[in-house]
A protein has these predicted regions:
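Active-site/binding-pocket entry motifs
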Residues: 11, 38-40, 78, 99, ...
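Low-complexity, Lys/Gly-biased intrinsically disordered segments
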Residues: 2-43, 58-60
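A short beta-sheet element
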Residues: 34-35, 55-56, 60-117
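Short, structured beta-strand/loop micro-motifs enriched in basic residues and often containing a Trp
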Residues: 46-56
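Non-catalytic DNA-recognition/assembly elements of restriction-modification systems
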Residues: 1-16, 144, 148-182
Length: 182
């Protein structure tokens, strides 16, 4: 079936539209992600910013990311790039990210991420981009985007295959770096 992103999600929101006050306090501060922290398969936690706890409480009351949510970049050169939140970390998000909460009874989050990152979805995003200068995907356009959705058992097979390929790539790179590969 072909379904809209909106029909595949129980929640679609973006982060705060206010530029936050950041803190250097990584102990008491809370992680704050923007589009620069989302790669095509994962969240890059290596260079994130932090916000004070009082601001976190306000933001977290509105958007509360949970494990298996999809974080998708809405603007900038990486617009349309999605990653699965595979952690129970508590964090907040900026307006440059959309949070998509998949209905896991009809779509596997890892399959959903792959479908969003596909060339077909990128073409749909390209045709609905708003803004001169910095590209911007509006939530309304994201919701209307169509995704090919096979039965869940086929999605799960796909995910198992992709994970096995990723493991093979990792082991191959590790062996090469260790000088084991011929």
């Amino acid at each position: 079936k072909v379904l809209t992103i909106e029909s595949l999600c129980s929640l679609i929101k973006d982060g705060t539209h206010q530029t936050p006050t950041y803190t250097e306090d990584t102990i008491n501060g809370f992680k704050f992600l923007s589009s620069k922290d989302v790669m095509s398969k994962k969240i890059d936690w290596s260079d994130i910013k932090y916000i004070p706890s009082d601001l976190h409480e306000k933001l977290y009351a509105v958007v509360k990311p949970i494990k298996n949510d999809i974080l998708m970049s809405k603007n900038g050169v990486n617009y349309g790039v999605a990653a699965v939140n595979d952690t129970d970390e508590v964090f907040d998000i900026y307006v440059s990210l959309a949070l998509l909460r998949p209905k896991t009874d009809i779509i596997n989050p890892v399959y959903f991420r792959s479908a969003i990152n596909s060339p077909d979805t990128k073409r749909q995003f390209d045709s609905s981009i708003k803004g001169i200068g910095v590209p911007n995907l509006h939530l309304g356009e994201i919701k209307k985007t169509k995704i090919l959705v096979p039965p869940v058992d086929k999605q799960n097979e796909y995910v198992s295959f992709v994970e096995q390929v990723d493991k093979s790539k990792y082991h191959g790179m590790f062996a090469f770096e260790m000088g084991v590969a011929a």
